[in-house]
Swiss-Prot record:
It holds the Pfam family Rubis-subs-bind. CDD domains: SET_SETD3. This is Actin-histidine N-methyltransferase. It comes from Canis lupus familiaris (Dog). Its main location: cytoplasm. It catalyses: L-histidyl-[protein] + S-adenosyl-L-methionine = N(tele)-methyl-L-histidyl-[protein] + S-adenosyl-L-homocysteine + H(+). Phosphorylated by GSK3B, which is required for recognition by the SCF(FBXW7) complex and subsequent degradation. Ubiquitinated by the SCF(FBXW7) complex following phosphorylation by GSK3B, leading to its degradation by the proteasome. The gene is SETD3. Residues 94-314 form the SET domain. It is found in: Cytoplasm; Nucleus. Residues 567-579 have a biased composition (Basic and acidic residues). Keywords: Actin-binding, Cytoplasm, Methyltransferase, Nucleus, Phosphoprotein, S-adenosyl-L-methionine, Transferase, Ubl conjugation. The SET domain specifically recognizes and binds actin, suggesting that it does not accommodate substrates diverging from actin.
Length: 588
């Protein structure tokens, strides 16, 4: 999968001979599980909790040093075996080769001219590692008994990967040997590198991801040591935190949803070869062909011989890319920052505002997004702000007035203001809110730019600083845009300009409100690949496979959510989750 990290080459060796008492580790993991299962810390206490959890994890890592399974040689040494294995099992291997693109990591390079929309890559089901293949493997007996494995396909895939890696005769060895030895996701950050993310919106998701991963490891360490169905697992004598972090990171950056063989539902999968593709802006061009039972990818654009072949991972923000994929994508046209807004229940007009919002399909409290592109405000956010700033008379017009339903349908349309005064108030409010968010950062835009120019930073520190810089630039842009709109509408109001009115259609019931149309993935919610689309051949469809979809075993949901339910794992190409519960493609 494109842009997945390979910070260093694979270590030599076949595993470790070091010995550590299972009881000693069990005591440490029990302490870790207790710490990670405690209630969420209060405001301002998250960093303290993170440091405490990290301290326990580091103690465990120190005791387990040398116990992890590794492969001899470099990752790229195994590429010929991967291509041979893929070819022998029905995958396409003509027209491209695997190459190290330095900063972008390994990717695919065209060896011939490839036309836009040309089918150039397909991978049959038999090559995929899926939840179904996990059930039919040595992991099957434990899967049948463990509710967390049953509920969280992400974790099942991670253990499937670990078990197959430990088996030198595994069918998937040619694939597993080419996976990165480590990643650039925050799970691998040093403490100082995580500190660079403090005050960013992303930091809460970073803390949550680390805590969830530590809790899962502690829980499953005990399961593997004590559960009778775990006796035959090749992990029994050496299940390290390092191994688990690697496995969940591999899954996090690569997992996708595909239809099951009968097409009745979806399952999670790792897709060899295809997951080497790196990301660029564009459209999703991968899907699943049920007729031929294979994943198929068509070219995003024309690629000439010698050029890198890119795919589009989905509409992910850079926070999602950094947290779940381990890279920062410059000029990300889908970058955004979150802004949480809600109507206070103490508002005298709360009931009326809630009713208007309900008719528009918008909650009274939600996480919206401010965007990198123009306009920075979506139709849904604009509709919310208009209702939020309505007077009692304006609310009555939208509830009881003539053509009230038609008014609801135009709430998200910038061409039809509620009133000039309403526009002035909403843009003033947004300007103030974005300005306040900017003040929460400990550094300025200029300071971040200077720091990037004048310091020799690690890859991870650079990503962290670019991320906080990007957040501030989006907020600053929103402030300027809001200020310009405020002044524009103030002049309209002062001039007594006539208010534009939408042509009354009388057919409102047959239309969807503009605010409800799927104009964007608010709060980074990614669309799922529908079964209908999954059945079709690979085309440049909007909901296809995305490199590195993840609904999180190690994402950013609360501990309870992460342990007790399978976070809406979305269709292929980047199952990113709402409000950072996602995981995207990481650097190769």
């Amino acid at each position: 999968m494109g842009k997945k990290s390979r910070v260093k080459t694979q270590k030599s060796g076949t595993g470790a001979t070091a010995s550590v008492s299972p009881k000693e580790t069990l005591n440490l993991t029990s302490e870790l599980l207790q710490k990670c299962s405690s209630p969420a810390p209060g405001p301002g206490k998250e960093w303290e909790e993170y440091v405490q959890i990290r301290s326990l994890v580091e103690k465990i890592r120190k005791k387990q040093k040398g116990l992890s399974v590794t492969f001899d040689g470099k990752r790229e040494d195994y590429f010929p075996d991967l291509m041979k294995w893929a070819s022998e099992n029905g995958a396409s291997v003509e027209g491209f080769e695997m190459v190290n693109f330095k900063e972008e990591g390994f990717g695919l390079r065209a060896t011939r001219d490839i036309k836009a929309e040309e089918l150039f890559l397909w991978v049959p089901r038999k090559l995929l590692m899926t939840v179904e293949s996990a059930k039919n493997s040595v992991l099957g007996p434990l899967y049948s008994q463990d509710r967390i494995l049953q509920a969280m396909g992400n974790i099942t895939l991670a253990f499937h990967l670990l078990c197959e890696r430990a088996d030198p005769n595994s069918f998937w060895q040619p694939y597993i040997q080419t996976l990165p030895s480590e990643y650039d996701t925050p799970l691998y950050f040093e403490e100082d590198e995580v500190r660079d993310l403090q005050s960013t919106q992303a930091i809460h998701d970073v803390f949550s991801q680390y805590k969830n991963t530590a809790r899962q490891y502690a829980y499953f360490y005990k399961v593997i040591q004590t559960h009778p169905h775990a006796n035959k697992l090749p992990l029994k004598d050496a299940f390290t935190y390092e191994d688990y972090r690697w496995a969940v990171s591999s899954v996090m950056t690569r997992q996708n949803q595909i239809p099951t063989e009968d097409g009745s539902r979806v399952t999670l999968a790792l897709i060899p070869l295809w997951d080497m593709c790196n990301h660029t802006n564009g459209l999703i061009t991968t899907g699943y062909n049920l007729e031929d039972d294979r994943c198929e990818c068509v070219a995003l654009r024309d690629f000439r011989a010698g050029e890198q072949i890119y795919i589009f991972y989905g509409t992910r923000s850079n926070a999602e890319f950094v947290i779940h994929s381990g890279f920062f994508f410059d000029n990300n046209s889908h970058d955004r920052v979150k802004i949480k807004l809600g109507v206070s229940k103490s508002d005298r007009l709360y009931a009326m505002k809630a009713e208007v919002l309900a008719r528009a399909g918008i909650p009274t409290s939600s996480v919206f997004a401010l965007h990198y592109t123009d306009p920075p405000v979506s139709a849904q956010l604009l509709a919310f702000l208009r209702v939020f700033c309505m007077t009692e008379e304006e609310l009555k017009e939208h509830l009881l007035g003539d053509n009230a339903l038609d008014r609801i349908f135009t709430l998200g349309n910038s061409e039809y203001p509620v009133s000039w005064d309403n526009e002035v108030r909403l843009w003033t409010f947004l300007e103030d809110r974005a300005s306040l968010l900017l003040k929460t950062y400990k550094t300025t835009i200029e300071e971040d730019k200077s720091f990037l120019r004048n310091h020799d930073l690690s890859v991870r520190a650079t990503m962290a600083i670019k991320l906080r810089l990007g957040e501030k630039e989006i907020l600053e842009k929103a402030v300027k845009s809001a200020a310009a709109n405020r002044e524009h509408y103030r002049k309209q109001m002062q001039a007594g300009a006539p208010l534009p009115r939408c042509e009354e259609s009388g057919t409102a019931g047959a239309r969807l409100p503009l605010a409800l149309r799927d104009l964007e993935a608010e709060a980074s919610v990614q669309e799922a690949l529908s079964l209908t689309e999954a059945v079709g051949r690979a085309k440049a469809v909007e909901n296809g496979l995305v490199n590195g979809e993840n609904s999180i075993p190690n994402g950013t949901r609360s501990g309870k959510e992460n342990f007790n339910q399978e976070g809406s794992e979305r269709a292929t190409e980047g199952t990113k989750e709402s409000s950072s519960d996602s995981t995207a493609g990481a650097r190769e």
